[in-house]
Swiss-Prot record:
GO BP term, example: response to exogenous dsRNA
Gene3D superfamilies in the record: 1.20.1250.10
SMART domains, alphabetized: IFabd (SM00076)
The species this protein was found in: Homo sapiens (Human)
Entry keywords, A to Z: Antiviral defense, Cytokine, Disulfide bond, Secreted, Signal
Entry similarity comment: Belongs to the alpha/beta interferon family.
Name of this chain's protein: Interferon alpha-16
Pfam families linked: Interferon
Cellular-component GO terms for this entry: extracellular region; extracellular space
Length: 189
């Protein structure tokens, strides 16, 4: 799906805002971003959960990656970033754009893009660019494998409306888990 001019302009403005902002307030930023993303995901639902019960699937969400007791702030930021990047990639496909209302999907893209920018600024501030890749390989790999399972599920179900509904609910669940980690980090600060 080609992104509309207005969407691209909004992304440009949000990028500029992120670059110009100083400091990293992960708990505040991530909590608000997650809340907005969850609201948009809820609005995107087109069919009843009950009509898709037969399509439910356990994607094996890597809960250990989002356990607030095991992570330092920089590691958590890196895990959040990967989850949001993979969510953006998943919902940016041609098959995804056919499944959802275009206006809501554009708003969801913008929200995810804003969160990615905020998290990139935070992770760079917390640990520096060189250390990011080495620090969190296992957790990033776990998140990538999780999203690979989601993608394979969608392919196996031929991107059916119920398959997308199951995935939408799963992504909402994953955003809720990351919110719990964020709360744990707030208690540590």
């Amino acid at each position: 799906m080609a992104l509309s001019f207005s969407l691209l302009m909004a992304v440009l403005v949000l990028s500029y805002k992120s670059i110009c902002s100083l400091g990293c307030d992960l708990p505040q930023t991530h909590s608000l971003g997650n809340r907005r993303a969850l609201i948009l995901l809820a609005q995107m639902g087109r069919i009843s959960h009950f009509s898709c019960l037969k399509d439910r699937y356990d994607f094996g969400f890597p809960q250990e990656v989002f356990d607030g007791n095991q992570f330092q702030k920089a590691q958590a930021i890196s895990a959040f970033h990967e989850m949001i990047q993979q969510t953006f990639n998943l919902f940016s496909t041609k098959d995804s754009s056919a499944a959802w209302d275009e206006t809501l999907l554009d708003k969801f893209y913008i929200e995810l893009f804003q969160q990615l920018n905020d998290l990139e600024a935070c992770v760079t501030q917390e640990v520096g660019v060189e250390e990011i890749a080495l620090m969190n390989e296992d957790s990033i790999l776990a998140v990538r494998k999780y999203f690979q399972r989601i993608t394979l599920y969608l392919m196996g179900k031929k991107y059916s409306p119920c398959a997308w509904e199951v995935v939408r609910a799963e992504i909402m669940r994953s955003f809720s888990f990351s919110t719990n980690l964020q709360k744990g980090l707030r208690r540590k600060d």
